[in-house]
Amino acid sequence: MHAASQTLSVGQKAGWGLADMGVVVFVIVKQLLVLSFLTNYLSVPVGIAGLLTTSILIFDIITDPIVGYLSDRTNSRWGRRAPWMAIGAVILSLGIIGLFGVPQSLRLYGTIIWVGSFFGLATIGFTMVAIPYGATAGEMTLDPKERSTMMGFRMAFASVGILAVSYTHLTLPTRRGV
């Protein structure tokens, strides 16, 4: 995608901003729901659950600039960002399915390894989507006013995602019932 100074349609800006709803949903899953899921549903002790989630967040801090660097240097017929986002979406989806699809037959350490592996997979998939996605605004237009409007749509949809996940988090059942 090459930046141009043409005006983007409202639909293009809104469509671009809508993607951030999915991005923010996973951020909240990563920072809120996984810890609750580990402790309230899987009965993982709080200290171990905290160590696991912190380790994955540190992993995320390391992988973000690496993916940004690699995506900046990708040359493909689909552009620099699209291959990363497409592959990342598949990896993220598989990671989320595995993260919340923990076999009940696992004991504590098996559960920790399972969740840690799939949480790490989901996190790298998320990074492969979110980092290139964030860079696309500058490639869609050179006009700072257009990019500002795009960011407005992005933040509006992010807010909707935050509200939706916040409500869902309050209604999630635990192993002991609602």
Language-model features: where?
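Membrane-embedded alpha-helical bundles of multi-pass transporters/translocases
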Residues: 2-170, 175
